[in-house]
Amino acid sequence: MSVELLPHSTEPHANGADKSVSAAARVTQSLKKQQVFDAEQVKLQSATDELKSAQMFAPQTPITAIDDVVDEALAAHPQALDVESIRPKLHQSRRWSWLARLSLMALLLLTLVQTVLGLRDAWLESPWLFSFYGAVLGIVGSWAIVGVIGEYRKLKRLKQVADTQETGARLALSMQMGEADGFIDNIVRHYPDSQGLQRLRHSLKDEHNDAEKVLLFEDLVLTERDELAKKIVRRYAAESAVLLAASPLAVLDMAIILWRNQRMLRDVAACYGIELGYWSRIKLIRSIVINIIYAGTSELVTDLGTQLLSVEMTGKLSARLAQGLGGGLLTARLGYQAMALCRPIRFKDEQRPKLTKVHQELLMELKQFAGNLLTKDGRDALKTQLEGTEVNTSSKEKSLS
């Protein structure tokens, strides 16, 4: 019995072992399959997330880049024009240039020959006449030489502003030390002593790099110069607006604008240490006109929109007041362009003066001017002033008699 029971007792154990081995194999295979499936699922899930992120952000990326490029182009366009407009034109025709040089040399040679022949004839006729002619020619020649040298220096000083602006833009990004001192000294020697210069001298330290020194110079000195130039521009713009509103003739309007703008450009340039001569003034006016014509799109739309809206609203009240407002805004625009061309460091976008603040002051000036002319109180005040002037004049005449 025991012999027969042994096989029956070992067979269940063998079957149980086989079952446990097969179960373990199935569990292992299932685990491997589960691991492989999990890895593939993770890869698929990551790829799906990348596709979703690409779908979400890919369409917006080129739009943002295009907007940045457009903004940078609009911001950089007027500055590039400001620099290039001051520089002498190098693309002029050589044929006209050589003809101009030959013509000038021929005229100078002809003048010299005629002068020598005239002096020789005067010497043969009378030594006293020769002395008189020689003295007159010496005085006129000395005056002409001094004037030419002065005009050349003033024109050269104006043309150097473009190079100074390029150097300032480069030093504003420089982490080196030593070059900014000479750059600042070369500029401030043309400026009068002021509180900004004193604060700059106390603020500059040896451990400051070039970018920090240029930033201090712009914040302490140039900001002070900018405020003074803005006051000059606003004053001349207000005077031009009132004079144009009171002027009855178009020819007189043109003379007033030309006269006031010439004085304004001279005073604005003097704020930045630039003395204008005849040719340098013509060069500056030419550069201003070029910058106004080829101004950036955003700046042009803002300024013209402000000007046209203000002139249209004022024109409904009075055509003469609208004419004065337009002339005042034109004067202010010329003054602001002169500031940009004469400033040794280029304006930043947030620092560039706008016409939106000037037209409010012009409207207030014209409103006060119109009120003095149209209201009864204004007429009574004017009548009182005239009567007082007549009384003072008559009393002076009686005292003299």
Curated annotation (Swiss-Prot):
Q: Where is this chain's protein located in or outside the cell?
A: Cell inner membrane
- Keyword terms, alphabetized: Cell inner membrane, Cell membrane, Membrane, Transmembrane, Transmembrane helix
User: For the region Disordered, what residue ranges are annotated?
Assistant: 1-22
- List membrane-spanning regions: 99-119, 129-149, 239-259
Q: Does the keyword Cell inner membrane apply?
A: yes
**Gene Ontology cellular component terms for the protein in this record:** plasma membrane
User: Does the keyword Transferase belong to this entry?
Assistant: no
Primary location group? membrane
Record family assignment:
Belongs to the UPF0283 family.
What name is this protein filed under?
UPF0283 membrane protein SO_1811
